[in-house]
């Protein structure tokens, strides 16, 4: 009769010991690093920036590093000098025109990574525009004969030029017609699929369908139209869009900035895949965060 009592007492003592020591065990947190990165931007708005920052902060948190955000100053040289004086580990640029700051930072020696653009001689992280061009054209040719497909280029957009360059061979093989975008461009008759190679032209074409200035039976394939992308897809204003992954771009940019600061990275271009989003796949788990970034 005593044996069950002894076992019960032992179980109680074990439970007390687990409560005292087991639940007080603390998981080691990453050691705080002195590395400090600055994301330099033109403005502090938009879902793209929000997701980019999440990617940066996630990559930094793994090694206990810090990321702050600053807006571009009117005095670029003074701002670059301040980065150097305050021992910033690296600067990550998300700027419409990064050239002046790149020049200023080169004079201070502060490592720099460019996001969203490909600039020779620098570490850059952007979407895979060459792949995006191929994906758009492949979808277009699956929807209509080459004679019904019109490619709309945009020479003012560097990323558009990369997309068009990637499809030159297919353009020639299929004798596809290209049209340079302008604010007063005229879309000739006889085409059912419009392939827009820039965000600007895609946005205007979608607005044209919405307003009735363009026929509603056009199939428009293009580049991410921004925070209205879900409405554009749901409303049939566009048939499919290639979309950047800003979270992945931010994560990769931070990793490359760390390597660059340690002297372990040559200048090069690093790209993130740009999935093709349409009404059939926009609600898949892997695409929801790209289509509805504000919900994340």
Residues covered by each model-derived region:
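Alpha-helical recognition/docking segments in bacterial nutrient-uptake
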Residues: 2-7, 18-131
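Hinge/cleft segment of the Venus flytrap/periplasmic-binding protein
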Residues: 24, 248, 252-296
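Short, solvent-exposed amphipathic alpha-helices that sit
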Residues: 48-63, 132-136, 158-178, 204, ...
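Short beta-strand elements in bilobed, periplasmic/extracellular small-molecule ligand-binding domains
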Residues: 60-77, 150-151, 168-185, 193
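Hydrophobic alpha-helical
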Residues: 91-108, 179-230
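Generic beta-sheet signal
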Residues: 115-116, 223, 244
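Hydrophobic alpha-helical segments within soluble ligand-binding/sensing domains
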Residues: 124-148, 227-229, 244-262
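Short beta-strand->loop
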Residues: 126, 149-158
């Amino acid at each position: 009769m005593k044996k069950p009592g002894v076992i019960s007492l032992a179980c109680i003592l074990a439970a007390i010991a687990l409560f005292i020591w087991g639940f007080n065990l603390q998981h080691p947190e990453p050691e705080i690093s002195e590395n400090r990165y600055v994301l330099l931007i033109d403005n502090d708005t938009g879902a793209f920036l929000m997701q980019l920052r999440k990617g940066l902060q996630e990559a930094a948190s793994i090694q206990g590093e810090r990321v702050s955000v600053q807006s571009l100053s009117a005095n670029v040289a003074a701002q670059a000098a301040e980065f150097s004086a305050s021992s910033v580990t690296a600067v990550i640029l998300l700027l419409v025109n990064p050239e002046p700051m790149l020049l200023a930072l080169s004079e201070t020696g502060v490592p720099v990574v460019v996001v969203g653009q490909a600039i020779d001689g620098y570490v850059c992280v952007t979407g895979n525009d060459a792949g995006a061009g191929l994906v758009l054209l492949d979808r277009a040719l699956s929807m209509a004969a080459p004679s019904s497909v019109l490619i709309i280029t945009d020479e003012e957009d560097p990323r558009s030029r990369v997309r068009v360059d990637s499809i030159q061979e297919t353009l020639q093989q299929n004798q596809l017609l290209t049209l340079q975008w302008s604010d007063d461009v005229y879309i000739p008759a006889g085409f059912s699929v419009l392939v827009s190679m820039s965000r600007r032209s895609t946005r205007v074409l979608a607005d044209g369908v919405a307003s009735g200035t363009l026929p509603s039976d056009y199939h428009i394939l293009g580049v991410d139209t921004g925070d209205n992308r879900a409405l554009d897809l749901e409303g049939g204003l566009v048939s499919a869009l290639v979309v950047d992954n800003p979270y992945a771009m931010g994560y990769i940019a931070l990793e490359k900035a760390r390597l660059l600061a340690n002297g372990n990275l040559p200048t090069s271009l690093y790209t993130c895949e740009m999935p093709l989003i349409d009404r059939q796949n926009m609600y898949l788990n892997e695409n929801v965060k790209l289509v509805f970034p504000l919900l994340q």
